[in-house]
């Protein structure tokens, strides 16, 4: 039995995903055949990048489970996508609240 309260949030465009202090535990995203970049920042759109992922040149989906206690985002989690090629982003997180 887990002692944590893992939550999820899903977005389809650049947006604030989580408000408040949170730990990112996992990411799942879907994309089309053109490479694009997904950036997760702490502190809003102009905040500090904590994780950057690039999609391959093939349509599909990618997932990343972050080990141990995850990545700490002190001031929420903001999703930034470089283009509409990234069609959906789902975050698994602990703490904070979905935006």
Segments (PLM) and residue ranges:
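Local beta-strand/beta-hairpin segments that build beta-sheet-rich folds
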Residues: 14-19, 47-56
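A short, sequence-level motif marking secondary-structure junctions
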Residues: 54-59, 95-96
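C-terminal interaction-tip segments
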Residues: 1-22, 30-32, 82-99
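Noncatalytic modules at the cell exterior or secretory-pathway interfaces
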Residues: 25-27, 70-84
């Amino acid at each position: 039995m887990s002692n944590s309260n893992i939550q999820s949030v899903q977005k389809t465009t650049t947006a604030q995903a989580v408000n408040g202090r949170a730990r990112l535990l996992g990411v799942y995203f879907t994309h089309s055949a053109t490479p694009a970049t997904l950036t997760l920042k702490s502190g809003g759109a102009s905040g500090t990048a904590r994780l950057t992922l690039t999609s391959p040149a093939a349509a599909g989906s990618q997932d990343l489970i972050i080990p141990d206690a995850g990545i700490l985002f002190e001031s929420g989690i903001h999703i930034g996508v470089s283009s509409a090629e990234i069609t959906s982003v789902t975050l698994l997180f602990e703490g904070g609240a979905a935006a």
